[in-house]
């Protein structure tokens, strides 16, 4: 964030005592979509905040997830798994079981990552995952540059594109 950037909260999803809040950050000057990103805005950055709302009068920002190659756009939670459309970061799948505290990336809670770029895409090899929707063992990932990806969940630690 800071001067020269456009920043805002894009999404929030409540699951149990946590609310997962996705922030987006873009340069205030439009950039090319080299390496992925949003046409007209360029690369997205951002953080997924984890807010403990067990006491709604006193919410606490307790954990975060911030990959270096994407921006938290849309999230979906099913059980103890979070599915994240991470713009140029593609699809990310996180284990959100137990207590969530601190940096979820360095704790190894990312259990899967699928880069959704394709050489035949409207912007070749440039992932731009808009969301991730889980339903009946499949994750549906709409990518602005390369179309719809359907990923089968085989187990908590393996995904098959």
Describe the function of each predicted region.
Residues 1-161:
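Feature marking well-ordered beta-strand scaffolds used for ligand recognition
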